[in-house]
């Protein structure tokens, strides 16, 4: 029962530990792929739900220390992750290798100007920027539609996110509240992660941009996730 779980959130052993066990199991399966970006989205989303559920700050401090050590270990055992971090700090140190994607992404965003080159007139998507239809779709949008396109995309995402959190706030039952908050936290964090990657603020993660990146099944699941809290907001059942 969600209400009983909320009462137990102050008790790490009864309320939080079972959730963490399931989380670490799922995270471990994802890392076997390996897919570090998706794993981090799930972990951060669950941590956000625990915070809303009323878990004490001492727990988050301890979890943060463990998380830093764990991420450090994952970076050490997988050299390509370290290469991504180093290329993020200085992509020009390896412009034809680990820094290639970031450099080509910036080449796409920079020349777009105010209005861009026009629809389907991108140059970087023609064998310059890898995965322009998935991870780096925002770079192509920036190149073809310029700063105006960037503003429109960011505004649409902010509208979706704000609306989703309003639904969470207005939910009449705890399950609907946690469901809508978790979904919107996941979508907003994934979008933020992707946008930060394409502008070179964080290392490449391989995370796609919700609603816009290529993939029919991904789009279908994202739309289903976003619409699922709405009936609960209306009926409270």
Where are the regions a protein language model picked out?
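Transmembrane alpha-helices of multi-pass inner-membrane enzymes
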Residues: 202-228
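Single conserved hydrophobic/aromatic residue that forms the stacking wall/gate
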Residues: 1-2, 226-237
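Hydrophobic aliphatic residues
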Residues: 89, 109, 223-224
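Residue-level marker of motif borders
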Residues: 29-30, 111, 201, 208
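Hydrophobic alpha-helical transmembrane segments of multi-pass inner membrane proteins, especially
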Residues: 3-101, 139-200
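Long extracytoplasmic/lumenal interhelical loops at the membrane interface
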Residues: 109, 113-148, 171
């Amino acid at each position: 029962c969600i209400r009983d779980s909320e009462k137990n959130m102050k008790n790490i052993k009864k309320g939080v530990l079972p959730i963490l066990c399931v989380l670490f199991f799922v995270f471990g399966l994802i890392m076997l792929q390996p897919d570090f970006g998706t794993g981090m989205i799930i972990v951060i989303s669950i941590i956000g739900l625990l915070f809303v559920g009323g878990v004490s700050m001492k727990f988050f401090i301890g979890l943060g220390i463990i998380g830093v050590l764990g991420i450090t270990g994952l970076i050490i055992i997988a050299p390509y992750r370290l290469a991504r971090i180093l290329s993020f700090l200085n992509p020009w140190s390896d412009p034809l290798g680990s820094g290639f994607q970031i450099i080509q992404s910036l080449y796409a965003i920079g020349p777009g100007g105010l209005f861009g080159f026009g629809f389907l007139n991108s140059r970087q998507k023609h064998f310059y920027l890898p995965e322009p239809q998935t991870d780096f779709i925002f770079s192509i949008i920036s190149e073809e539609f310029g700063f105006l396109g960037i503003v429109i995309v960011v505004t649409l995402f902010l509208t979706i996110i704000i609306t989703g959190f309003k639904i969470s706030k207005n939910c009449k039952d705890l399950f609907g509240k946690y469901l809508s908050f978790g979904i919107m936290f996941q979508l907003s964090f994934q979008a933020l992660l992707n946008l930060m990657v394409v502008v070179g603020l964080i290392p490449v993660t391989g995370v796609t941009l919700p609603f816009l990146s290529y993939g029919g099944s991904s789009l279908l699941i994202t739309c289903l996730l976003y619409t699922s809290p709405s009936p609960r907001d209306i009926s409270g059942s």
